[in-house]
């Protein structure tokens, strides 16, 4: 039996689910009557999604479709960082949506401080873009998970590597 138990707190998303969601958005754009003739483009890059369209109204419709398709695929809305809308050639608008991955040092420090302040029997250590939480009892770790789910961080948190 292990003397200590641990898990990792990470901020990540399933890339294949995102690819599927973007493919569904593109399919929707081709079939929806109000968006069919807008010549809207949605491109998925390594770390961003680029949307080009006729107007800001159409852009907002694409946002709604993207959020809906992502939610159906169990992707958090917090992975999307919507950039500012730019003017493109020919009365078109373009927007880049950065995909957030990993926990920043500031957020990792906030999580670590919350765990240290509220749970005396639990240790938290920052490891790159993840936080490792360890304790002698599994129940303590489950309590930490429940407490962190109540907090609202600007990134989506997943709990992995539960040992």
Swiss-Prot record:
<dbReference type="GO" id="GO:0005829">
    <property type="term" value="C:cytosol"/>
</dbReference>
<dbReference type="InterPro" id="IPR036183">
    <property type="entry name" value="YajQ-like_sf"/>
</dbReference>
<dbReference type="InterPro" id="IPR035571">
    <property type="entry name" value="UPF0234-like_C"/>
</dbReference>
<dbReference type="InterPro" id="IPR035570">
    <property type="entry name" value="UPF0234_N"/>
</dbReference>
<dbReference type="GO" id="GO:0000166">
    <property type="term" value="F:nucleotide binding"/>
</dbReference>
<protein>
    <recommendedName>
        <fullName>Nucleotide-binding protein Ava_2001</fullName>
    </recommendedName>
</protein>
<keyword id="KW-0547">Nucleotide-binding</keyword>
<dbReference type="Pfam" id="PF04461">
    <property type="entry name" value="DUF520"/>
</dbReference>
<comment type="similarity">
    <text>Belongs to the YajQ family.</text>
</comment>
<dbReference type="InterPro" id="IPR007551">
    <property type="entry name" value="DUF520"/>
</dbReference>
<comment type="function">
    <text>Nucleotide-binding protein.</text>
</comment>
């Amino acid at each position: 039996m292990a003397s200590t138990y641990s898990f990792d707190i990470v901020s990540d998303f399933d890339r294949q689910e995102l690819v599927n969601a973007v493919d569904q958005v593109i399919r929707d754009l081709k079939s929806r009557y109000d968006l069919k003739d807008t010549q809207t483009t949605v491109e998925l890059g390594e770390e961003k999604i680029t949307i080009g369209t006729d107007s800001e109204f159409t852009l907002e419709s694409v946002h709604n479709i993207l959020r809906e398709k992502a939610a159906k695929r169990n992707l958090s809305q917090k992975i999307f960082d919507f950039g500012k809308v730019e003017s493109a050639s020919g009365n078109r608008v373009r927007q880049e949506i950065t995909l957030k991955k990993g926990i920043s040092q500031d957020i990792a420090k906030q999580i670590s401080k919350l765990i240290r302040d509220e749970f005396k029997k639990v240790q938290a250590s920052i490891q790159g873009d993840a936080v490792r939480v360890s304790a002698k009892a599994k129940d303590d770790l489950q309590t930490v998970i429940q407490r962190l789910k109540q907090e609202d961080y600007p990134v989506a948190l997943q709990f992995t590597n539960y040992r």
